[in-house]
Amino acid sequence: MAAPRVFPLSCAVQQYAWGKMGYNSEVARLLASSDPLAQIAEDKPYAELWMGTHPRGDAKIFDNGISQKTLGQWIAENQDSLGSKVKDTFNGNLPFLFKVLSVETPLSIQAHPNKELAEKLHLQAPQHYPDANHKPEMAIALTPFQGLCGFRPVEEIVTFLKKVPEFQFLIGDEAATHLKQTMSHDSQAVASALQSCFSHLMKSEKKVVAEQLNLLVKRISQQVAAGNNMEDIFGELLLQLHQQYPGDIGCFAIYFLNLLNLKPGEAMFLEANVPHAYLKGDCVECMACSDNTVRAGLTPKFIDVPTLCEMLSYTPSSSKDRLFLPTRSQEDPYLSIYDPPVPDFAIMKMEVPGSVTEYKVLALDSASILLVVQGTVIASTPTTQTPIPLQRGGVLFIGANESVSLKLTEPKDLLIFRACCLL
């Protein structure tokens, strides 16, 4: 009998401190639904579910017909399951890590280097940059999701410089004036002025940052107490960030970066060198396999200011332009494809109404990982002997060129995400 090429996975949960607690976390709810033996602790954070072969969370295989115990081991011995192009392009490795994130408190403001810079940084400082790969990533909201992403239009930054004197103080009059003067100039002049302003902020002395932040927090708190609305300078968000990261330079970044409020199904794509931070909510995320992160604030960890200021993409764009839109499949009315401009990964979203009794997941020339977010199905393939029951939180590995038939076992809508590589 041929070895199975479609099988369920048991995936790693990461309990980082910023995660949502207990059953407030979508990660915990998915885990509890898919594993009846899972013990969810209400006083512990459930931050990330990892679906892939990353050494710090290689998915486990419990199929008795498979001798390998993890997905990484299995792929190493079943290279053709990746798909011929994927295998050759990515040296026999699964090129992506698929995740669910449940964010309670903001993650650090960060950017990820492109391939060329990653190789250089890894060579120079492997203790901070553990590999030589780039790390593009994409987040698709499962619940209302808030994040910072990319530099705002210059007009908006200039407005904040006028309305927030503490922000202007840290940037300095010269850099701020220069930015105002370049508003009507070409993109290169704008980028240069923006880099100068951001670098001034990032290179400010900690003591001065803390003083200015305290002044701003005091001013906003007094205005809010007096019943005034401070949302024109994101008063509530600033107070919240300061409470979580007192004195942190990242609190001022909200005046530089777009604030995105994603509705379920909306996405943002974070290409190399784009500053970003996840603030709160639940999402599915897919990324290239890398741990390289250059931090900019909202963190107690190492901040490499010179590298950060040098590498960032200083191209302003509106928050609307930062949304990444899926394309609807022509052949399948229930399928949307989020296909970013990188070779490492794509995400497919399948929303199947409960009135449908059977749904076919089409074969791809790529290994893929499928996550059930809503609904209950029984999966079968032409090559599997035993059908595989999957419910909410269930994760299925699908080898290249394998199709899967999903039988809906109850008349409830089905929501599935599938990470793959569309070369």
From Swiss-Prot:
> What Gene Ontology cellular-component terms does the record carry?
cytosol
Q: Where does Zn(2+) bind?
A: Q110, H112, E137, H276
* Alphabetized InterPro entries for the sequence: Man6P_Isoase-1, Mannose-6-P_Isomerase, Pmannose_isomerase-type1_CS, PMI_typeI_C, PMI_typeI_cat, PMI_typeI_hel, RmlC-like_jellyroll, RmlC_Cupin_sf
Q: Per its UniProt entry, what is the enzyme's top EC class, as one word?
A: isomerase
Q: Which residues carry this modification: Phosphoserine?
A: S102, S108
Q: Any note on cofactor binding?
A: Binds 1 zinc ion per subunit.
List the subcellular locations: Cytoplasm
This chain's protein is named Mannose-6-phosphate isomerase
Source organism: Macaca fascicularis (Crab-eating macaque)
